[in-house]
């Protein structure tokens, strides 16, 4: 699903943002 893909991106970007 497109939403799942977007959610994965958010998680990845979130990890990047944490650091």
UniProtKB/Swiss-Prot annotation:
Expressed by the venom gland. Binds 1 Ca(2+) ion. It is an enzyme of class 3 (hydrolase). It catalyses: a 1,2-diacyl-sn-glycero-3-phosphocholine + H2O = a 1-acyl-sn-glycero-3-phosphocholine + a fatty acid + H(+). Its main location: secreted. Transmembrane segments: none annotated. It is found in: Secreted. GO terms for molecular function: metal ion binding; phospholipase A2 activity; toxin activity. Contains 7 disulfide bonds. Its cofactor is Ca(2+). Its EC number is 3.1.1.4. Keywords: Blood coagulation cascade inhibiting toxin, Calcium, Cytolysis, Disulfide bond, Hemolysis, Hemostasis impairing toxin, Hydrolase, Lipid degradation, Lipid metabolism, Metal-binding, Secreted, Toxin. GO terms for cellular component: extracellular region. GO terms for biological process: killing of cells of another organism; lipid catabolic process. This phospholipase A2 is distinct from phospholipases of Russel's viper venom reported from other parts of India. Belongs to the phospholipase A2 family. Group II subfamily. Snake venom phospholipase A2 (PLA2) that shows enzymatic, indirect hemolytic and anticoagulant activities. Interestingly, anti-PFIIc'serum completely inhibits anticoagulant activity, partially inhibits the indirect hemolytic activity, but does not inhibit enzymatic activity. PLA2 catalyzes the calcium-dependent hydrolysis of the 2-acyl groups in 3-sn-phosphoglycerides. This is Neutral phospholipase A2 RVV-PFIIc'. The lineage of its organism: Eukaryota, Metazoa, Chordata, Craniata, Vertebrata.
């Amino acid at each position: 699903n497109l939403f799942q893909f977007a959610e994965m991106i958010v998680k990845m970007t979130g990890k990047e943002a944490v650091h």
